[in-house]
Regions:
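Conserved N-terminal subdomain of the carbohydrate kinase-like
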Residues: 1-39, 209-219
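Electropositive phosphate-/nucleotide-binding environments in soluble metabolic enzymes
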Residues: 2, 45-49, 79, 162, ...
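Structured loop/turn residues at beta-strand edges in well-structured enzyme cores
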Residues: 26-29, 90, 122
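Conserved phosphate-binding/catalytic region of the ribokinase-like
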Residues: 56-60, 108-219
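Nucleotide phosphate-binding site architecture
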Residues: 15, 103, 199
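Short secondary-structure boundary/capping segments
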Residues: 25-26, 86, 119, 128
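Conserved beta-alpha-beta core of the PfkB/ribokinase-like small-molecule kinase fold
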Residues: 33, 39-117, 125, 133-136
Length: 219
């Protein structure tokens, strides 16, 4: 893929100054899923408190929580991240992580399947491990599903992880089976990689048919 460069000035950014008081927490009980990211947890103490408030409301209301570890070495150390993750992950329904991020969480250099089981032991119902060009796998109900990455003319991989999450959660909310969720997530991430920028390539459900295969099928 072509090399891209992203400049993100986190210090003093709007995201770093968010507080729990800024959140419309009344929206959470009416939501079908709450998606959180480790970047928000890492930005500042106030943004971490905001995440905690949202998570607490979702837990009380019985709203499923999705959490992507999204580790960024520029924001905090692996030890700091692991400590925070271990307070959040047990309260989540779905956890997304790359192999490297999963190893930070569990503290062991395990393979993807082993990492999924280790994370599931912490409490989440579903664990999804993203492994870039090698594909992805999920552990749901004690069963492992794996889907290979699609061969595409990659232009820019920035945003592929978020696109993957969006595709997976879309499948979950539409009632797709675990493997179909992974297939949908893989297709959405592929679209993200075929254009510059982190959101510009986001597909509609109609767009997904252009890649062929079972991505638009809810089983």
């Amino acid at each position: 893929p072509h090399r891209g460069r992203v400049l993100y000035y986190r210090s003093g950014s709007a995201g770093s100054t968010i507080t729990a008081a800024m959140l419309d927490l009344d929206l959470i009980p009416r939501s079908r899923v709450l998606h959180l990211t480790g970047i928000t947890v890492a930005l500042s103490a106030s943004s971490r408190d905001a995440v905690e408030s949202a998570l607490s409301v979702a837990s009380i209301a019985g709203v499923p929580v999705s959490f992507d570890l999204n580790y960024r070495a520029a924001l905090w150390s692996e030890l700091e991240a692991r400590t925070a993750y271990r307070l959040i992950v047990p309260r989540c329904t779905v956890v997304f992580a790359s192999v490297a991020e999963a190893r930070i969480l569990v503290g062991k250099p395990l393979a993807a399947v082993e990492l999924a089981y280790e994370i599931a032991n912490l409490g989440p119902t579903e664990v999804v491990i993203k492994d870039g060009g090698r594909g992805s796998l999920s552990l749901v109900g004690g069963k492992i599903e794996s889907v290979p990455a699609l061969e595409i003319p990659a232009v820019d991989t920035v945003g592929a992880g978020d696109a993957f999450d969006a595709g997976y959660l879309s499948g979950l909310l539409r009632g797709a089976e675990p493997r179909a969720r992974l297939e949908l997530a893989t297709a959405v991430a592929a679209f993200a990689c075929m254009s510059s920028g982190d959101w510009e390539g986001s597909p509609t459900h109609a767009d997904l048919a252009l890649l062929g295969g079972p991505h638009d099928v809810v089983r």
